[in-house]
Amino acid sequence: MKETGKFGFWSIVLLGINGIVGTGIFLLPNKAYSIIGSASLGVLLFDAVIAGCIALCFAEAASLFTRNGGPYLYAKHALGDFWAFEVGVLKWIVTVIAWAAMAVGFATALGAAVPALSNDFAKDVISGILIIGLTIVNIFGVNVSKFVNNLITISKLVPLALFIAIGIFFINGANFTPVFPQDIYVDGSFAQAAVLLFFAYTGFEVIAIAAEDMKNPKKNLPRAIIMCMLLVSVLYMAILAVSIGVLGTDLANTKAPVQDAFNAIVGPIGMYIVLIGTLISMGGINFAEAYYAPRVATSMAEDGMLPSALAKRNRYNAPYVAAIVTAIASVLLAWSGSFTTLAAISAVSRFTQYLPTCLAVIIFRRKWADKARSYTIPGGYLIPVIAIGTSLWMLAQAQTNQLLWGLGGCIVILPFYYSYWKKKKAGLIKDHDEM
């Protein structure tokens, strides 16, 4: 693929922001405030730091590779084929589940805005069209995908930027005191709020999955991951601060905090601006899933871990077979509605991306001490160790059923790994030389 057709630095940043900023930011101010009051600003900053530690590990690992795969690739070279298989397959499965859920979420939100589209048949049609439409966009290659992603991401940020720029003049300082309201704060509130808000920062881990579609990924990916986290952190802090400053204690009782706050500032037009922003944001997250999901399967197929057909590309260099298979699975899940239970796997799966990558940074420093890196985390092993500890702590917060579903997912795919292992042992599969 020509370098001119690939994602440049700022397009990678926008791709990352699109993968992180979803509909959650339109709802989180209410949930966070109801748990811990205006101290939620401190919790959000705390989460930015700990999520940032994990993101820095991804940045350093990304500086060593140019292939697609991201966390799967890091696990393969640091921990071996078995853990790579578990990380890669679970990531692909969970992305399919997440895409189905997000497509239905978009259809549901559109139905709420347009009552005529709120019936089950309309939701099925809308979710199906959305998944198929975004798949077609991706099949036309990186140039088209880059343009669509840039357009969607900027469009989703405009309503949020307007909310912040206008809302900052309507902040009431008295709404920030007391920091810990007596009728809200109880023991354990900080941890509860920290877990809730942490997931608002997740999504950065998928940026490196499509490294081959990016200009100079060893240099640009680490910088883009760091820039994404900085911009998203500032955005989240500003949105929460304006929401608290405008609504005060009413923030704990509203179901649409950003929408209600903007309505209080500029009237009904503010509510509609946020509604449009919410729909665009949901569409953006769907696009991100459509873009990343096939590339996980393609990278594994190139290594012989999945059927070789999934590695096929068309004249636009798009992984069209993997894209079609992913889309079919997502549509069927969306129409069945069975993704709700399966989504429990995602809580555990996310940390199967984090832990191996954080460990990989430490292993790569020893294994490839002389290998050139465009980025190295300062402070020695301190930040990777903090990131590992954070991942374990967050995993410990998962519900028992989520842990069981995650463990079940790991076990179910074992026979497929055994099949791969037998073929590799027989010399039928060779390792991919490129990194």
Region locations from a protein language model:
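C-terminal membrane-solvent junction of multi-pass transporters and transport-like membrane proteins
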Residues: 148, 184, 309-320, 354-403, ...
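Membrane-interface loop-to-helix entry segments
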Residues: 122-173, 184, 225, 229, ...
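Select transmembrane alpha-helical segments in multipass membrane proteins
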Residues: 5-16, 80-93, 126-130, 184-197, ...
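Helix-loop-helix junctions that connect adjacent transmembrane segments
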Residues: 1-3, 41, 45, 117-124, ...
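Hydrophobic transmembrane alpha-helices that form the core helical bundles
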Residues: 31, 35, 43, 52-131, ...
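Membrane-interface "cap" regions at the ends of multi-pass membrane proteins
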Residues: 1-30, 34-39, 45, 51-52, ...
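Alpha-helical transmembrane segments of multipass membrane proteins
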Residues: 109, 113, 132-136, 164, ...
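TM-loop-TM module centered on a large, flexible mid-protein loop between adjacent transmembrane helices
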Residues: 73-74, 80, 111-116, 226-289, ...
